[in-house]
A protein has these predicted regions:
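Selected alpha-helical membrane-embedding segments in polytopic membrane proteins
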Residues: 12-109
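Hydrophobic core of alpha-helical transmembrane segments in multi-pass integral membrane proteins
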Residues: 52-53, 57, 179-185
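Single conserved hydrophobic/aromatic residue that forms the stacking wall/gate
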Residues: 1-11
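Helix-loop junctions at the membrane-solvent interface of multi-pass transporters
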Residues: 62, 134-135, 189
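Hydrophobic alpha-helical transmembrane segments and adjacent short intramembrane/lumenal linkers
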Residues: 98-184
């Protein structure tokens, strides 16, 4: 296949898995459990972070106008904020969830598995950032929809993470809190540093 055709297939596959995770998480987690754990970075997380950044960049330019260097600087700052918060939040959440598995649930230390889980579980955050980047008026609705991540994590906890049924609710709540809070905390710190450094 040509390189262009392969890229089109990759983009289609990314959106297919994202839509499946949102519409039918159990079936999506079954498919994900069969794939290479390291594939999550290049096949899903990095492209989704890139799309989130692009969406916010375009939305910021549209909101602030195209004229002047200030509008471009603002758009770049917003783009970096989203990319840094999602990237750092993803790795921080994965690290903390792995620690949670080891300490609270007496499971093996398995960073690649947890990175795969966290990457795909963040699908709700990724999709909302893409939509809010272009349509910022939906921020309140997005805040409420953010908690759909709990259902995605609930399904993934049994299928991919193999959490025992008795521990599943506790794992789901704690993991969901980490997946929502870690990017938010990093975004807050990034914003404060941006203000201080300007």
């Amino acid at each position: 296949l040509s390189i262009r055709r392969q890229r089109q297939m990759c983009i289609r596959d990314r959106f297919h898995i994202a839509m499946q995770l949102i519409s039918s998480p159990a079936r999506a987690w079954e498919e994900i459990s069969l794939e290479d754990r390291r594939k999550v970075f290049t096949a899903f997380v990095y492209p989704m972070i890139g799309l989130c950044g692009l969406s916010v960049f375009i939305g910021s330019l549209v909101a602030k106008g195209w004229g002047g260097p200030q509008s471009f600087q603002y758009a770049m700052t917003q783009c970096c904020e989203v990319a840094v918060s999602l990237f750092g939040g993803y790795f921080l959440a994965a690290y903390l969830i792995n620690g949670l598995r080891v300490r609270m649930f007496a499971m093996d230390n398995d960073i690649p598995l947890v990175q795969q889980f966290a990457g795909y579980a963040l699908v709700v955050s990724f999709m909302l950032k893409i939509i809010i980047g272009i349509l910022p008026d939906f921020s309140i609705i997005a805040l409420l929809l953010q908690f759909y991540i709990v259902y995605v994590v609930w399904e993934g906890s049994a299928i991919l993470m193999k959490i025992a049924e008795k521990d599943r609710l506790r794992f789901t709540i704690l993991s969901s809190m980490l997946l929502i809070a870690c990017p938010a905390v990093i975004e807050f710190v990034f914003n404060k540093l941006t203000v201080v450094l300007n």
